[in-house]
Amino acid sequence: MDFHRANRNLQLVESGVSDGRNPESFSLDETQVPVSSGFSSDSDKDQQEQIFINTQVQGRLDEAEEADKVRANLGQFRYDSQDSAISPKHKSAIQRPSARTTKRSSSSQRRKAPTKAQSLLKQLSGKHAKVQDMIKYQQKLDSLAGSQQRAKSKGKTTKTKKQQEKRYDTYNANEWQHIYNLLLEKFPHTRPSEVEDVYQYLYGDESEDQPLWNESQRPIEPESQDLGFLPPPPADKQRVSVLSLSQVMDDKHSREPDEDIIVPDSTDEEYIVIPIPSSPQPLRPPLATKPPLLTKPPLKKVESDAGTPKTAHSPSDGVIDLTNGSFKVVKSLISPLKEETAQVQVPATRMPTLGTTPNLAPTKEQPLRYRLHRSQLESFSAVEGLIVCSPGPSQDDVPVPDTESEDSAAEDHCMVELQPSILASRTPSPSVQSDWNSQSAQQLRQSMKSLGLKTSRSKRQMLHSLQQASQVLEIDTGGQENQRQEIHDYLTSLVQSSPVLLEKVYTFQPIASKELLTKLTEANPFVDVIDEYTIREWADYQGICLTTS
């Protein structure tokens, strides 16, 4: 054991307790490396290096402080021309406004109550900004009109009432009634005076002058001045002189008025000029009197007196002479467009004495027509292919009442048409009926789909539907291409027999599908068997607009 080392350690501990030092406060060099003369050179080197590092850091800090001072001195000259009055310590109070999501209105706008016109326009359109622009533009026009009116009446001493500019709207009576009903539905407690104010705002005050539209609807007043009689046109204006190219280019030829080529007017007939009589006769007969009918003059026997001289008038005279001969009718005055046809006399033996009577029995293609009383239609409602038509009165179908039923009105009767082909094909043939019974339910469904009929689960219902279809259509088991077209033609005939549906189709009005099916089913229950897809396909082909509602 090294006693010298232990003694030395005890001395070090004893000296540390006596000095009052804390072992925790010892540095790393003092605890690990004892202070001796041999380690003095290493500690001096460490101190010198630490001093060198501190000088570098301090130099950097000094440079940073100097740069800050320079920036502070130069910052006051940066915006001297703009912000000279503003203190650099305080920021400007004027800032960019932030985006406002809500639209604020001024206190004056909140205090001002909206007018009835503004509320009405807002209720009708639903766009507040659009209505405000319209009202501002109208107020601008009113202010311009008012300024012009004041400039015109500046020299007058009396104050004239500013005439408001009349405004006309495109609303007719039906549209205004619709608007009036909407206002009453929206505001049930509206007084009639308020509605009248809105009407006067749109159409103006009726107490003032009549609007332009009312003025345009007035009948034309007859002119007070008497037109008198038209003077006869001069004779020289009835003819147009035309020269040919050779006559114009020929300088040696002396042209005279009589040698000109005269081209008559297209309305003149054989150079006839009928002068207007000078007697005071009205040009137009009064409307109350009926115009005289043009009657054919009676034939007159040719006189056998050959000694009496007769003046023969040429067709170009156009003069009616009543002194000599019979009355001569100018054909151009009666019918200027009718051409004269040569009349050939046929001897009496040529004329047939027995005329052929028309065949009154209808053919197979012609429909059978019956005239029935409307009370008897219920008993014939079960007949398939029966078309009820009520045409307008004509000369061919004039109802002649019986002597016993003279009191009955003509409107109580109607005409009924029935096609003979439908009568022949009402019941299916036994071969077709046996084919249906022999087919399975799946085959019946396929055949009904190809025909355009509704399918069902039970075979009995499908056979009943096919039997109803056979009463209207000619069902053939061989081919089924034309049977769908026959259904389309049958639906078209049903629509043609209904005046209400026909009017809607002609005017391109949309028809509800339920309404169409109901009316067609009432006309014939067979429509209830037809598939809805087939009916829509037929409507597309015919241009009928169907709606679901």
Swiss-Prot record:
Keyword list, A-Z: DNA damage, DNA recombination, DNA repair, Nucleus, Phosphoprotein
Start-end of Low complexity biased regions: 96-108
Highest taxon above the source species: Eukaryota
Major localization class: nucleus
Coiled coil: none
Transmembrane segments: none
Compartmental location: Nucleus
Modification after translation, per record: Phosphorylated in response to DNA damage.
InterPro entries: Structure-sp_endonuc_su_Slx4
Biased composition (Pro residues): 277-289
Chain intervals for the UniProt region annotation (Disordered): 1-48, 81-127, 142-165, 275-319, 390-410
Biological process terms in GO annotation: DNA recombination; DNA repair; DNA replication
DNA repair listed as a keyword: yes
Role: Regulatory subunit of the SLX1-SLX4 structure-specific endonuclease that resolves DNA secondary structures generated during DNA repair and recombination. Has endonuclease activity towards branched DNA substrates, introducing single-strand cuts in duplex DNA close to junctions with ss-DNA.
Family named by the database record: Belongs to the SLX4 family.
Assembly and oligomerization: Forms a heterodimer with SLX1.
Protein's name according to its UniProt entry: Structure-specific endonuclease subunit SLX4
